[in-house]
């Protein structure tokens, strides 16, 4: 009887979780899922398109939730409304700052340099610790200073 009850509770938890995933506490990080994403001036398809993103994986900060819409802030600080289903909970980041920065073999300033990346490069964000983050661009990855990434750390 207890096993059946636990199984039922587990099943109910699985069914309820996707609905709650859309109601996360803001702010939180997300990435652009679609090949093309319209940012609107309000939370409806009736509002004017203010900007079109054409960069899957671009990190955004979700700052407000309204039904199927999310108010986002992009790396340039621009804000607008997008359809929630076109965002992914996957973590990504974009290289910021001036000039190239290094992707290193290990999370240490004196670790060998594997690659150099330019500001504006978008990649997948891994774990961050002690000011360093795992960062992958295509099939190339390494460790990069957290301060050179927008999309890392607390939103």
Stretch-by-stretch model annotation:
Residues 44-47:
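Second-shell loop/turn segments in exported
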Residues 1-2:
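N-terminal secretory signal peptides that target proteins for export/translocation
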Residues 21-41, 52-56, 63-78, 82-107, ...:
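SH3-family beta-barrel domains
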Residues 5-15:
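Bacterial N-terminal signal peptides
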